[in-house]
Amino acid sequence: MSRQRPVIGVFDSGFGGLTVLREIVRLVPNAEYLYFGDTARLPYGTKSADTVARYALGACHFLEGQGAEHLVIACNTATALAMDAIEAKANVPAIGVVEPGASAAAAISKTRSVAVIGTEATISSHAYHHALERLGINAYEKATPLLVPLVEEGWTDHPVTKQVAEIYLQDAFVRREQRSDVLVLGCTHYPLIRPLLRKVVPSDVAIVDSAESTAKALAKKLGIAPPSASAAGATQAAGARAQMAPSAPEPKEGTPDFRFFVTDSVQKFRRLGSGFLGHPVDNVEHVDLGG
């Protein structure tokens, strides 16, 4: 691998972290990417904090062994339950998705009140609540677990998904002492239903995508300025071409290079992953990290 380009390891329990990878590639195109999806052991939301931390550390050490120089924990549950352990035991810098999402929401909230949706485990951890509280923001947290299987089913613009979202969010933006004026997407599946959620929440409520916020935070850490709109479009096209020809001997300057690792079905990851990443997913390897 070229030492001229950063090698960035991205970890998630499954597919949702690909939305984070998509945003990172848009801002940091000239890099080599290693993505690890622990698909055999998802969902992490049903596991204990100790188990999640053990799985997450195993994934991080695997990515380090593959040459990762920076780690992105592209999983809200792993960030919420294991970030302290990762920061203490990882051998390279690591960034999670909670702090960037909370910071982005705090920066734009005028009412100083923010709503957060996520999986049961993420919400129960109160990770966003604590992060927002440190920034002087009140948090309204709501677990919305049914949205995850609906996204994986491909029902990103389905009436059933819209109805489920409406039921979950019916109390999120009612008039309280401080009405929430920002909605944080605290699950990496949810960017795929952002247009649908835009129809559900009031028009004056801003939506913050933790994937976008995390990508910006990583780019800032790397000292990389955001590309222009035209450059970003060219990067996405280059990424698609790179996926279609993964065996190219040396990626061109500015072209991302990808390797994907999964602990379960390679075929399923290719099929579902393309929807999350936005272009074909290839160069996928099966790995077994054991218990």
UniProtKB/Swiss-Prot annotation:
Pathway: Cell wall biogenesis; peptidoglycan biosynthesis. GO terms for molecular function: glutamate racemase activity. It catalyses: L-glutamate = D-glutamate. The active site is at 75 (proton donor/acceptor), 187 (proton donor/acceptor). Substrate binds at residues 12-13, 44-45, 76-77, 188-189. Coiled coil: none annotated. Residues 234-247 have a biased composition (Low complexity). Transmembrane segments: none annotated. The keyword DNA repair does not apply. Its EC number is 5.1.1.3. GO terms for biological process: cell wall organization; peptidoglycan biosynthetic process; regulation of cell shape. Residues 234-257 are annotated as: Disordered. It holds the Pfam family Asp_Glu_race. Keywords: Cell shape, Cell wall biogenesis/degradation, Isomerase, Peptidoglycan synthesis. InterPro entries: Asp/Glu/hydantoin_racemase, Asp/Glu_race, Asp/Glu_racemase_AS_1, Asp/Glu_racemase_AS_2, Glu_race. Belongs to the aspartate/glutamate racemases family. Provides the (R)-glutamate required for cell wall biosynthesis. This is Glutamate racemase. It comes from Koribacter versatilis (strain Ellin345).
